[in-house]
């Protein structure tokens, strides 16, 4: 069960945060791409309640090797295995937005460091899903997740200076089903292009980056929101 929350104080909220804290009322049975990537189901594990038996059965626990964003890895573990997941729109918590000087506040504006931490999160998810062969069965979904978590923001915020992030991604994907041509041919063209660029450690040109971002935004959010994001990116807005 995953519920909603309010940013606290309310004026500290921003578009992305307000959206992800506002799930709709819906239930999913079994594995669902929509639950993982289309709904406002992530991040923030404190708004998700799980049965103890479920967690014990699948040996799901927090990965203590991750110092930043461990809730992303935990939620990918539970949503990837859950037989039934319900999202409710009720806003049951007030979430204090990052305090000045906190880890989350520090990371928010250190783009490369934050994205390298996101690569560590992705590596943990990949290892966890490998336990039950979920990485083989859903390699194309994990490629989408890589773009969502790392690659889109790498080209949006770092542009042609994303080499260190791409190098870290290439290392994580070495030998993985996610980086295989068999998986990438099943992906949307924008997803496959971003993953291939990371594997080759070759940042696209500025024009190609803008085109990739727009195509990916259409894929994940629809044409109208993609146009809004494109305008926001051109204006240099970070929180879109």
Model feature map: region roles:
Residues 129-133, 156-161:
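Secondary-structure edge/capping motif, primarily at the C-terminal ends of alpha-helices
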Residues 1-113, 119, 133, 152:
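Donor-binding/catalytic cores of nucleotide-activated saccharide
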Residues 143-153:
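Amphipathic alpha-helical repeat scaffolds of TPR domains
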């Amino acid at each position: 069960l995953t519920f909603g929350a309010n940013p606290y104080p309310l004026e500290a909220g921003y578009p992305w945060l307000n959206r992800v804290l506002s799930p709709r009322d819906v239930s999913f049975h079994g594995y669902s791409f929509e639950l993982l990537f289309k709904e406002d189901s992530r991040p923030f594990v404190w708004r998700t309640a799980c049965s103890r038996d479920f967690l014990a059965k699948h040996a799901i626990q927090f990965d203590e090797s991750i110092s930043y964003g461990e809730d992303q890895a935990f939620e990918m573990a539970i949503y990837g295995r859950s037989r039934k997941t319900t999202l409710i729109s009720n806003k049951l918590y007030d979430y204090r937005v990052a305090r000045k000087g906190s880890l989350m506040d520090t990371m928010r504006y250190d783009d490369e460091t934050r994205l390298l931490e996101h690569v560590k999160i992705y590596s943990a998810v990949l290892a966890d899903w490998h336990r039950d062969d979920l990485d083989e069965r859903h390699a194309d979904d994990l490629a989408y997740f890589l773009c969502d978590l790392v690659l889109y923001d790498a080209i949006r915020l770092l542009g042609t200076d994303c080499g260190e992030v791409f190098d870290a991604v290439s290392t994580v994907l070495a030998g993985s089903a996610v980086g295989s041509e068999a998986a990438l041919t099943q992906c949307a063209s924008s997803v496959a292009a971003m993953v291939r660029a990371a594997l080759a450690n070759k940042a696209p040109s500025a024009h190609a980056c803008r085109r990739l971002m727009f195509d990916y935004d259409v894929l994940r959010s629809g044409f109208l929101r993609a146009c809004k994001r494109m305008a926001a990116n051109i204006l240099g807005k970070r929180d879109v």
